[in-house]
């Protein structure tokens, strides 16, 4: 996924990420990514990944991605349970967003470091700094105190070992 993102930036475009709750959605997303000749990220929510069926979905998405005509990453998105992250990687996730943003900066850093030690260097590790209230499906008004503090970014990335960073800049 790192190479996928770097190539997109160099080409002047983004790599879209779509949350896939089922295989049919993933098929449609990958088909359109192939039609556009663009890389894509298939996200799986922790709630979906937390069941045997969800882990099977991750495995199926990995196979779909391996046979796609464009680069496809499979990411466990916004996971705060280290053991779930490990199970998702074992099932085939190629990237994880280790979300320790509910804790202090130090707790978040320690959580991301723990996840890195559990999943190894081959899995792309994204972390979150700052938070938006609500969830992916329902957002609430945020305060500035919950947004990413730009003064913390460099230290957090260096100390945590995250390769990618999800920042909270507000809702549009």
Question: Positions of the model-derived regions?
Answer:
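Alpha/beta enzyme core
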Residues: 1-11, 21-48, 55-71, 79-172
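Boundary/entry segment of secreted carbohydrate-active catalytic domains
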Residues: 13-17
